[in-house]
Swiss-Prot record:
Transmembrane spans: 179-199, 265-285, 294-316
Any Pfam family: CNNM
Extracellular topological domain residue ranges: 1-178, 286-293
Domain CNNM transmembrane: 178-358
Protein name: Metal transporter CNNM4
Keyword ATP-binding belongs to the record: no
Gene coding for it: CNNM4
Biological function: Probable metal transporter. The interaction with the metal ion chaperone COX11 suggests that it may play a role in sensory neuron functions. May play a role in biomineralization and retinal function.
Source organism superkingdom: Eukaryota
Localization (cell): Cell membrane
Length: 775
């Protein structure tokens, strides 16, 4: 180690040498910065400048020189030190010839007035950057551009120094002029915007109109719609050509609109935003919303404009359309199959004018080819059928009539073996009393039996029925299950009515139907059903032999022709039981040797009678009037209606009431207990007092054997009361209830029920004996 203070280089020699070399360089740099900024950092120094923004066209050219438009406001970003100490009067610009002569001089001999420095704003916290606002004036007409350089000074009264680098240069160029007057510019933009909307709307409206739909409108639309469709349909057939023309026109108009807006506004961003908003709102949304709802009317009224643009774009759009036709084929038109058509009708039901029944019929007709007879047939076990060995007596014919069917299958041995068809009209000349065998009728008419297979479609079945062979068919299928040979198995019946019901989707009911639906077996209301079995004489109630047909005729005649027996007074059920009561239907054998025998007289003049008579068979002589006029009558003539409702002259004071018996029965709605008491009391009087009986003023004498109906007043009144009991089983009086037992206690009339009240044998025999004694 060397001694201290010995010879050699001083400690740190190399480092100290480098520091001594760097010191002069640092001084030179600081001097240069001071000379460029014309002041110390405390006075403010500008290091650089670049373009921040402007309100017109501006930017930087490829050489890095800033260019701005005349008559604009330019914001320049300045960088340096202590920029907050720099005021606007320390910054200016001078005009230079070109960038090459910029270095020849550093002094600003003449400041320009074309650039006006406003102020320095937005200075940063460190005073290292700020924005200089500069206003550019308009160039002279002979000038298209000028070049300016930045000039600065350190003091307000100091000399101006010019910057000599390209960063300090500023080009001011002439503002691009409009190639059209302002009013024409705006008018052209408006026209293009309207055309853009028309093309966009027609593109949606016309292309949405299907050629098939246009043909439909031509045939079934309104007069105006037909006229519109006739105008549009020829050009709509050329779908691709029309599409290309509309799209080319739309693109051309939108492009031109954007260029005009850019020229009018002068800013690229604003032009793009304005054209986008205008095209979207006025060129797309509004016209498409309008044409989607009124495409037919808009397309017809703009047909000339459409044809014009088709002609204008023909050189380009027509070849393109042919290429589309070649590669894509012809336009696919809307065609609805059965399922789509049915679904369309269902979906549009709230908007069309079809009622539900019409919609059901259309749906049923469309489903005709998809359903089979097995879907609508009546199962064999639910069919009404008749044996081939049946006898057509009253019971059998009543059963046939009660079934309500007009075509009845005839089977032999078992129901699946159907051999004939019986039509109800075949029985028109058949007398039930003859007990004709059914085979006699079926062999005489020999109606063909029509068989169909279970998978037969309903449209084919309808065609078979239309041929008139039969309106009823037997449904069968080939049963090849199990061992043995296949055989035909009968499944059920199908009729023309079943097919029609399936078409109209509703049940057809007439007065003879028993079921609303053969498949659901829902029965029809039986309020109109006639029970022919009630006229059978199997119970031997009638002592006089009378045919069920004559009994039925007498019942209907009394109920409809004789007001005293109308259903409003006596129910049909009570009337029928009254007719079947013993001694109501009587016979009289005529004695040829004693024509004026007393028993031949049904009525004798001036003698009391309390009965009504209806002639069923035979002939009588009637003598009436002071002149003793005589005339003959026959079947279904009747006498003594007044005897049924006459009022007794000696009413018992024990039953004071203002309402007589006959009057109360004339108004069945009134149910006063006093009336009931009057009925009971009057009944006893009629049975015992001759003075209360009807006195006939005519005579009726039999001329031949007679069969007639004889109804006494007692029976008639009991029938009235029974009918009232049937509708109202209790008589209310002053909020209380009088039962039938109490009514029986007040009179000799037995307890009123459906049997004893209507037909009291003891009273009937009493009246009969009284009548014979009176005669």
């Amino acid at each position: 180690m060397a001694p201290v203070g010995g010879g050699g280089r001083p400690v740190g020699g190399p480092a100290r040498g480098r520091l001594l070399l760097a010191a002069p360089v640092l001084l030179v740099l600081l001097w240069a910065l001071g000379a460029r900024g014309q002041g110390s950092p405390q006075q403010g120094t500008i290091v650089g400048m670049r373009l921040a923004s402007c309100n017109k066209s501006c930017g930087t050219n490829p050489d890095g020189i800033i260019f701005v438009s005349e008559g604009s406001t330019v914001n320049l970003r300045l960088y340096g030190y202590s920029l907050g100490n720099i005021s606007s009067n320390l910054i200016s610009f001078t005009e230079v010839d070109d960038a090459e002569t910029l270095h020849k001089s550093t002094s600003c001999l003449e400041l320009t007035k074309d650039l006006v420095v406003q102020q320095l704003v937005n200075v940063s916290r460190g005073n290292t950057s700020g924005v200089l606002v500069v206003l550019t004036k308009f160039l002279r007409r002979s000038e298209s551009m000028k070049l300016y350089a930045l000039c600065t000074r350190a003091q307000p009264d100091g000399p101006w120094l010019k910057w000599t680098d390209k960063d300090s240069l500023l080009f001011m160029v002439e503002e691009p002029g409009r190639f059209l007057p302002l009013w024409l510019h705006i008018l052209l933009i408006t026209v293009l915007l309207v055309l853009s909307g028309i093309f966009s709307g027609l593109n949606l409206g016309l292309m949405a109109l299907d050629p098939m739909e246009l043909r439909i409108v031509q045939n079934c639309g309104t007069e105006k719609e037909r006229r519109y469709a006739r105008k549009i349909e020829p050009i709509r057939r050329k779908g691709n050509y029309l599409l290309c023309s509309l799209l080319l026109g739309n693109v051309l108009v939108n492009t031109s609109l954007t260029i005009l807006l850019d020229n009018l506004i002068g800013s690229g961003l604003m032009a793009v935003a304005s054209s986008t908003i205008g095209i979207v709102i006025f060129g797309e949304i509004l016209p498409q919303a309008l044409c989607s709802r009124h495409g037919l009317a808009v397309g017809a009224n703009t047909i000339l404009l459409t044809k014009f643009f088709m002609l204008l774009t023909f050189p380009l759009s027509f070849p393109i359309s042919k290429l589309l036709d070649f590669f894509l084929g012809q336009e696919i038109r809307t065609v609805y199959n059965r399922e789509k058509l049915m679904e369309m009708l269902k979906v549009t039901e709230p908007y069309n004018d079809l009622v539900k029944e019409e919609l059901n019929m259309i749906q049923g007709a469309l489903e005709l080819r998809t359903k089979t007879v097995e879907d609508i047939m009546t199962q064999l076990q639910d069919c009404f059928m008749i044996r081939s060995d049946a006898i057509l007596d009253f019971n059998t014919m009543s059963e046939i009539m009660e079934s309500g069917y007009t075509r009845i299958p005839v089977f032999e041995d078992e129901q699946s073996n159907i051999v004939d068809i019986l039509y109800v009209k075949d029985l028109a000349f058949v007398d039930p009393d003859d007990c004709t065998p059914l085979k006699t009728i079926t062999r005489f008419y020999n109606h063909p039996v029509h068989f169909v297979f279970h998978d037969t479609k309903l449209d084919a079945m309808l065609e078979e029925f239309k041929k008139g062979k039969s309106h009823l068919a037997i449904v069968q299928k080939v049963n090849n299950e199990g061992e043995g040979d296949p055989f035909y198995e009968v499944l059920g019946l199908v009729t023309l009515e079943d097919v029609i019901e399936e078409i109209i989707k509703s049940e057809i009911l007439d007065e003879s139907d028993m079921y609303t639906d053969n498949r659901s077996r829902k029965r029809v209301s039986e309020k109109n059903k006639r029970d022919f079995s009630a006229f059978k004489d199997a119970d031997n109630e009638l002592k006089v032999k009378i045919s069920p047909q004559l009994l039925l005729a007498a019942h209907r005649f009394l109920a409809t022709e004789v007001s005293q027996f109308s259903p409003s007074l006596i129910s049909e059920k009570i009337l029928l039981r009254l007719l079947k009561y013993p001694d109501v239907i009587q016979e009289l054998k005529f004695d040829e040797h004693n024509k004026y025998y007393a028993r031949h007289y049904l009525y004798t003049r001036n003698k009391p009678a309390d009965y009504f008579i209806l002639i069923l068979q035979g002939k009588v002589e009637v003598e009436a009037g002071k002149e003793n006029m005589k005339f003959e009558t026959g079947a279904f003539s009747y006498y003594g209606t007044m005897a049924l409702t006459s009022v007794p002259s000696d009413r018992s004071p024990a039953h004071p009431t203002p309402l007589s018996r006959s009057a109360s029965l004339s108004y069945p709605d009134r149910t006063d207990v006093s009336t009931a008491a009057t009925l009971a009391g009057s009944s006893n009087q009629f049975g015992s007092s001759v003075l209360g009986q009807y006195i006939s003023d005519f005579s009726v004498r039999a001329l031949v054997d007679l069969q007639y109906i004889k109804i006494t007043r007692q029976q008639y009144q009991n029938g009235l009361l029974a009918s009232r009991m049937e509708n109202s089983p209790q008589f209310p009086i002053d909020g209380c209830t009088t039962h039938m037992e109490n009514l029986a206690e007040k009179s000799e009339l037995p307890v009123v029920d459906e049997t004893t009240t209507l037909l009291n044998e003891r009273n009937s025999l009493l009246h009969k004996a009284s009548h014979e004694n009176a005669i």
